[in-house]
């Protein structure tokens, strides 16, 4: 059997619907419900609900997000296979069976999401409106659609290559690479990080085209006040974790048309920049391993930004340093940067993969000195790898997910 891992925060109407949908088809399945200090009566509802196969965990402290709660639930679960399942999802018939028939050790299987027309269409999902909220959910129509689709030869036993929630895998394989990176707490982009690590670890990634969930979308952490309106806390989390992802991987997230991650090379790149100011330093710094610049406010930058990132900026930002020893060094004049040239820098790993050669070369305003080009991304598979940890500051025990600054800024914006 399989364990369902469901994090929640102030999402009780959706949680009730999600658990009810699972119980409709899987009375004995273990459900691990992880409550991120909700104040909506979730704990009271659980205490009044008799379900011998429901395990409940409540975080009584500050919000940690699903990044942390997923891993707590996975470690708690009793079965060797688990499924990440969002609180705003509804389980369809044969959900488990049509995942497990494709799952083997060192594999990750995603189901197919059916969603209302709130986001752009995609080849990895089905856009069909069975309701916007639990109260208007068309359950019988959804179940009929699932069963009819499962009998359709274009879906039955078919898999494609993509990964997204909900997904399932062996607990042992998840723990083998260290689980989610908790420094993406509370959310988002923790999924893209671990998906890339799954692929680099050699795990077989598939999507089952006849395992279905209905997904209301974004109700757990993004649209907490109004559908299709990102709340302010989510926006702050996005800004924090976008920079964290870029500093960690040296590039931004990219997926193909079926939502299979396109992993770019991670090179040891240093920027040597003249005519740099504080604003340009902030824009450029995340996109390289080190930056040497003539910005007179470079120390102020480190002081201002360090509280918001666990990456050690004293190892990343230097003033007119002759000690830059990166594998690849790029010199340029920041006063000549345009949006097009900045975009070129953000795509540099992919460009170097296609056309980089050892030695010195020039392109537009950029001068390259390429000593070597080892790809380092495979060193990021496990959270505790030396390459990653050596680039971080010592994380305080009083701020283990390094979110104090995030919550301070959020409080000041209220």
Where are these regions (language model features)?
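Short aromatic/hydrophobic "clamp" motif used to bind/position activated sugar donors
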Residues: 82, 329
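A conserved hydrophobic helix/loop-capping motif in glycosyltransferases and polysaccharide synthases
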Residues: 2-14, 18, 25-26, 34, ...
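A conserved acidic beta->alpha catalytic loop
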Residues: 35-44, 90, 296-300
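Short, acidic, metal-binding catalytic loop of nucleotide-sugar glycosyltransferases
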Residues: 20-29, 283-289
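A short, conserved alpha-helix in the catalytic core of glycosyltransferases
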Residues: 161-178, 184-212
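A recurrent flexible, glycine/aromatic-enriched loop bordering the glycosyltransferase active site
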Residues: 68, 139, 145-172
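Glycine-rich, basic loop-to-helix element that forms the pyrophosphate-binding segment
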Residues: 60-77
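Conserved donor NDP-sugar-binding/catalytic core segment of glycosyltransferases
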Residues: 90-136
């Amino acid at each position: 059997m399989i364990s369902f891992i469901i994090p929640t925060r102030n999402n009780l109407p959706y949680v009730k619907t999600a658990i009810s949908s699972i119980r409709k088809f899987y009375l004995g399945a273990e459900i691990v419900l992880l409550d991120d200090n909700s104040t909506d009566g979730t704990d009271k509802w659980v205490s009044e609900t008799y379900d011998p196969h429901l395990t409940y965990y409540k975080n009584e402290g500050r919000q940690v997000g699903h990044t942390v709660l997923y891993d707590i639930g996975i470690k708690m679960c009793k079965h060797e296979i688990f499924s990440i399942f969002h609180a705003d999802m509804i389980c369809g018939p044969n959900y488990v069976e049509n995942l497990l028939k494709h799952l083997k050790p060192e594999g990750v299987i995603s189901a197919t999401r059916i969603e209302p027309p709130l986001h752009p269409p995609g080849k990895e999902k089905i856009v069909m409106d069975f309701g916007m909220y639990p109260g208007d959910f068309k359950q019988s129509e959804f179940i009929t659609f699932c069963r009819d689709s499962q009998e359709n030869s274009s879906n039955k036993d078919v898999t494609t290559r993509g990964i997204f929630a909900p997904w399932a895998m062996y607990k042992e394989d998840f723990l083998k690479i260290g689980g989610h990176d908790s420094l993406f707490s509370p959310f988002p982009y923790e999924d893209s990080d671990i998906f890339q690590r799954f692929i680099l670890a050699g795990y077989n990634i598939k999507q089952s085209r006849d395992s279905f969930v209905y997904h209301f979308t974004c109700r757990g952490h993004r649209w907490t006040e109004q559908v299709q309106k990102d709340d302010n806390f989510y926006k702050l989390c996005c800004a924090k974790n976008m920079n964290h992802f870029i500093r960690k991987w040296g590039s931004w997230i990219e997926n193909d048309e079926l939502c299979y991650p396109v992993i770019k090379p991670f090179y040891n790149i240093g920027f040597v920049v003249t005519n740099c100011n504080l604003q340009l330093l902030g824009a450029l710094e995340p996109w390289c391993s080190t930056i040497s610049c003539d910005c007179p406010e470079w120390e102020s930058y480190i002081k201002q930004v360090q509280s918001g990132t666990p990456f050690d900026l004293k190892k990343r930002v230097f003033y007119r340093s002759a000690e830059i020893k990166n594998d690849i060094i790029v010199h340029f004049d920041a006063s000549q940067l345009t949006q097009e040239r900045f975009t070129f820098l953000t795509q540099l790993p992919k460009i170097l993969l296609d056309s980089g050669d050892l030695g010195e070369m020039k392109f537009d305003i950029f001068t390259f000195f390429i000593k070597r080009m080892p790809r380092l991304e495979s060193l990021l598979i496990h959270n505790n790898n030396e390459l990653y940890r050596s680039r971080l500051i010592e994380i305080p025990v009083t701020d283990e997910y390094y979110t104090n600054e995030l919550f301070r800024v959020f409080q000041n914006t209220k």
